[in-house]
């Protein structure tokens, strides 16, 4: 009987493969099932929020905390969670994350108050953070370098498919079962991932991984990420010049500065700054931020365009996004093969150029644009993003030493979170500014009668998301004209947002020129110093 063998990453110790345990492809299956649960949750919950608001008589702020509490917990703890995997083993960390995510999902479904839901959503975010870096860490230490891209490609395809399925599955569950089912669905998926993980995954950790925790570094980094992400989340509502926004962003800068100073002096740092002496790793991190800025920030407006301008239901809008996600699902494994053969640089540059072209194409959409042209830009965007998601992840993870595989996975996920939050906030401000500039002129050109300042402000606010408010004091005969003014104002703002997103994607294409995959013998141990307390262990 043949035995599967491959070159293991240097400095990694794990239990020898036996049966299914420790085999690369079964490991990918087990990891993918767990990550599928997190990816599905990232889009499915948004569909349930209106039903939760109505059923529990929640305020808009309460519902926002259901989403923001999860996002904050996730963003704050990703790198620390990756460090836990490096220290205690990625298998154990992943399984704790899976079990905790499933249990908190069940608790949310059983909750009878918004406060309880928010608490469990925060816990859910913490457990989700345990899973994602550990998943990449397990792939890094299980797959040989020549097949890692393919594994990441399939993993990315699963994430894309689950994300795409979220609105469709969520809409069906909310409509036919209830909002609780959106969370209960994680329980059987979590049990499947837990059983698969217990049977298949093997303990894997780097022999040279530090044995202590940089508590000061954890506190400073967590505080910096919290202030940064929260400031970006609230900036559109508070205003960029508001003292609260400036205060949180200033606190983030100070905390990051303190974290950098701490890491430069720590014996066993949370995230060794020497990692960033690797130009490809640094470029990959910047590229991930820029990609998320343009993609997530731009995609934020697509939902409003489909639902508020074209009048689609959440399920229908999810279906119309399938050309985008379908190309990502198909393209991710193919991209893994191409990158394995030719390296990441070329595919990443081409991918970001396609992304820029598709975003600029979407900037030309009008209120009456057909779904054919919209789908064309979605297909092009999916083809562009597929190699970027795979290649950037591989560049970051493969250029970090094996003992920091979890930290590298957390860095990759954190870069995406920060980029997405920054893109949504900045493009949202540009969108609102453009709508505010063109709305009065379009109102006057349409010869609509004057309304009171409060009603005019409410209509303009609705126009920022393409929603047509009730006519209010306007005579009913003006309803059609009001709709045209609102939609044309929204389209103008969306066009500017997509234009800027495309420009950022073009900058990302230039950054991609500095990326490459690390060779197995290229990274000398002294480039990433090992603490004296752990040197020589093994």
UniProtKB/Swiss-Prot annotation:
Belongs to the major facilitator superfamily. EmrB family. It is found in: Cell membrane. One of its GO terms (biological process) is response to antibiotic. It holds the Pfam family MFS_1. The chain crosses the membrane at residues 28-48, 65-85, 100-120, 126-146, 154-174, 181-201, 213-233, 239-259, 286-306, 319-339, 342-362, 371-391, 413-433, 494-514. It comes from the Bacteria. This is Tetracenomycin C resistance and export protein. The keyword Glycoprotein does not apply. It is a multi-pass membrane protein. The keyword Cell membrane applies. One of its GO terms (cellular component) is plasma membrane. GO terms for molecular function: transmembrane transporter activity. PROSITE patterns: MFS (PS50850). Keywords: Antibiotic biosynthesis, Antibiotic resistance, Cell membrane, Membrane, Transmembrane, Transmembrane helix, Transport. Resistance to tetracenomycin C by an active tetracenomycin C efflux system which is probably energized by transmembrane electrochemical gradients. Pathway: Antibiotic biosynthesis; tetracenomycin C biosynthesis.
